[in-house]
Amino acid sequence: MSEMTPREIVSELDKHIIGQNNAKRSVAIALRNRWRRMQLNEELRHEVTPKNILMIGPTGVGKTEIARRLAKLANAPFIKVEATKFTEVGYVGKEVDSIIRDLTDAAVKMVRVQAIEKNRYRAEELAEERILDVLIPPAKNNWGQTEQQQEPSAARQAFRKKLREGQLDDKEIEIDLAAAPMGVEIMAPPGMEEMTSQLQSMFQNLGGQKQKARKLKIKDAMKLLIEEEAAKLVNPEELKQDAIDAVEQHGIVFIDEIDKICKRGESSGPDVSREGVQRDLLPLVEGCTVSTKHGMVKTDHILFIASGAFQIAKPSDLIPELQGRLPIRVELQALTTSDFERILTEPNASITVQYKALMATEGVNIEFTDSGIKRIAEAAWQVNESTENIGARRLHTVLERLMEEISYDASDLSGQNITIDADYVSKHLDALVADEDLSRFIL
């Protein structure tokens, strides 16, 4: 898991997300507390439970982006789910237990990649030997068995040197590779995904591992052989146990749109996709044991981060038991014009940088001036105020409209320099921004 300090985590998030310092600090502290807990003695470590977070803020201010960036920084099993995808146990739809199953699957993939990377050097050596065996077959005795030689032959050493220098990369050889497992597509009703995956695993394992001869260039064969040899060096049972440990000790679940499962007003009959889902989430957040195809997983120390816009519902509309299990509340602020200006220029891969790079592929040089950036930000803010406030997502709509003409004619504009200043933006957007009806449908 990540050993970054809260200050370092916030600094990394600052490269991609503008503002929202309170939210960044909260997730940074929560992530660092995962590391701190692992430094305690085992008895005390078991007693320290994660402080789950509820992020509250209008749409388009950075809640989901914080989750995306956190997943890359955490170096721990991480999954993001939409609360609206689930229904109460016993009804058609996904059960909340599938969150932990998906998290465990993600952990198995992560641990497998780490194990393969750890064994890569040894796998490269074994792959090299297999290719050399094809190029210079080893000597055999009278019974057809390969003789063990004390020292590699001079020819083998010469070919090894050429192989490492890349002189043989384009030479074609025929090698035996593990055949891909038999693919079986099984249709199952919603909520029975676990049974489907188990049946698919069973069919794939029928008949054992088969070899298939393939004719490939040496550089392509080397990549496949390294993967195959690295996979052989990994112990599947150890891998599963390591993955389960990683989920139990370091797992993070991000639940988006949690405000959409709040009960609104009085209603009769079962509320299977709202209050019912909240009741089913309770045991997961509090701590329970979930059965997965890799083994039993305890959720006591998994960190849950929930987020929602709460424009119609309020955090107090969540059932009291769930409110109590999300003790840290963070409010994200609506974005201003100056925030929009910073979003257009400061992030490492800002929208303007992306558009400039895309147009550069056609030989068109785009330059955004400070006045142009300011006018784009003002136009986006103005449309948000007069119609629906969708936060920073409005910048994508406005910029796409602004760049439409250039994008269409880019192949005919090769070699030209185009400056996007305040006058250019006003010429292309002012009429749309001023007309509220047009803004509502076009921007």
Swiss-Prot record:
Induction: By heat shock. The keyword Nucleotide-binding applies. It is found in: Cytoplasm. Keywords: ATP-binding, Chaperone, Cytoplasm, Nucleotide-binding, Stress response. One of its GO terms (biological process) is protein unfolding. Its main location: cytoplasm. ATP binds at residues 18, 60-65, 256, 321, 393. GO terms for cellular component: HslUV protease complex. InterPro entries: AAA+_ATPase, ATP-dep_Clp_protease_ClpX, ATPase_AAA_core, Clp_ATPase_C, HslU, P-loop_NTPase. The keyword Chaperone applies. One of its GO terms (molecular function) is ATP hydrolysis activity. It comes from the Bacteria. SMART domains: AAA, ClpB_D2-small. Belongs to the ClpX chaperone family. HslU subfamily. ATPase subunit of a proteasome-like degradation complex; this subunit has chaperone activity. The binding of ATP and its subsequent hydrolysis by HslU are essential for unfolding of protein substrates subsequently hydrolyzed by HslV. HslU recognizes the N-terminal part of its protein substrates and unfolds these before they are guided to HslV for hydrolysis. A double ring-shaped homohexamer of HslV is capped on each side by a ring-shaped HslU homohexamer. The assembly of the HslU/HslV complex is dependent on binding of ATP. PANTHER family: ATP-DEPENDENT CLP PROTEASE ATP-BINDING SUBUNIT CLPX-LIKE, MITOCHONDRIAL-RELATED (PTHR48102), ATP-DEPENDENT PROTEASE ATPASE SUBUNIT HSLU (PTHR48102:SF3). This is ATP-dependent protease ATPase subunit HslU. It comes from Escherichia coli O157:H7 (strain EC4115 / EHEC).
